[in-house]
């Protein structure tokens, strides 16, 4: 297997795929050594039948630059997801989805892939195509395993800035994806507690 890690961050206007909309997302593709291969980023039109969560919107508007980036010049979701599928399939290896945490970002990407492209994100015993190889990587879980920290203690503000490549966690999807890509690079080269040199 020649994996390419597709580290992804999303921005949304509420917690529930379908009831709310994904506003923007970005992916950074890394090779097994942690070298950056390529990036993808997009801003999406909101789903016509979906609403927005007032608490999420209030929080998001506390980051005006990120809010503007996630809502300016959006493209139709079907066009974005088609481009994304083509981009992932064009990567030089087996694409492995990665996110922090996997359960949140992965659920949104899966929902949009199924709705607009008719394919699933992850491999499993389901009918139809899958875009990514294996079950995906949860960077939060990997961080807990590598560091020995409690899972709940593994969050962006707890990591040393150099682990994130000194990329600010700005809530711009490309910034956050790049920071998490740096985190994965760090974790790939880190030994877990108690392992032999």
Language model segments and positions:
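Amphipathic alpha-helical interface surfaces
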Residues: 77-84, 105-112, 135-139
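Conserved non-catalytic scaffold segment of RNase H-like nuclease domains
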Residues: 2-6, 11-102
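Substrate-recognition/cap helix-loop segment adjacent to the acidic, metal-dependent catalytic center
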Residues: 103-134
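A short, structured active-site edge motif that brings together acidic residues
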Residues: 42-45, 123-143
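Active-site-proximal helix-loop-helix substrate-binding element of RNase H-like nuclease domains
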Residues: 46-49, 57, 136-177
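Glycine-rich, phosphate-binding/catalytic loops in enzymes
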Residues: 22-26, 113-117, 191
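Generic detector of well-ordered alpha-helical packing
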Residues: 10-12, 106, 139, 177
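Acidic, Mg2+-coordinating catalytic module of metal-dependent nucleases/exonucleases
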Residues: 96-102, 107-108, 154-197
